Amino acid sequence: YLFYYFKPKLEFDFKSLFSEISKKEMYRFSLFAFAGSLGSVFAFRIDSLMIPKFISMEANGAFSIGVTLASALAVPATGIFILYAPIISNFIKNNQISELDLKYKEISKLLFFIGALLYSCIFLGIDNLFMLLPTHESLTGSIPVILILGFNVLINMATGFNGEIITYSKYYKFNLIAIGLLIILNVSLNLLFIKVLNYGIEGVAVASLISMIVFNLSKLLFIYKKFKILPFDISYLKLILVFATVLLISYYLPILDNHLLNLIYKTIFCLSLNLMVIYKLKLVFSYNFWVEKMIQKLQF
């Protein structure tokens, strides 16, 4: 159908690409973007190089389990970042800072909402889930790593699209500086926790968490300095308080003898209570919009 109505043809005229910016500026941006991407890959893979070197291959296997499960938390964020990338770029291009501020806060709360729901399930259910598996003895040691790295991902989601704001602005070079800071800090803390304090893979996970907090904090402060916007407001603080309270209540619920029942009832209780309270308080605009839309459809 597409080939029939839209005849494909090759064009080698790239003049339209440089109608608004010069080739030099385009090449400079591409170089910094490539260097930043390469630096990010190295920064987030440095642990898998240092653990076999300073601890053991077995420890690296346990750490990799934690990385894989924690990374699953970030899947929704990846899709949302891709979806909103052109919107962010357009706001910055047209200097619509007030609109950018509103979207920044809205998406940050949405990402934290999704991430906190998933992290709560992992926090409450990971131990019982592993106890149901025949290999639970070999998996138990990775639970602290999973929880720390999961919180690491949650912190990254909670700060919203701060990296995208910097990337699509004239301050895109700062991303490379921030990634350089992340690499130096991560390597230094890994050496401290592994070689000096002998904390093993838990120490590596803590090092990653501290590095990620500093990394995101540096970007938040930079964005505030240049644009005078932050992803946090009063409703965001209420959202954090709701999740923390519900998680605490769920954690101290009576423990059942059956691991499967314990896994199901604690996670369902936590999810249900969070969803109801957050809907009633109208803390996440997108969530309330989706729920009300579903209710309207069911009424018809």
Locate predicted features.
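Membrane-proximal transmembrane or re-entrant/amphipathic helices at the cytosolic face
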Residues: 10, 249-300
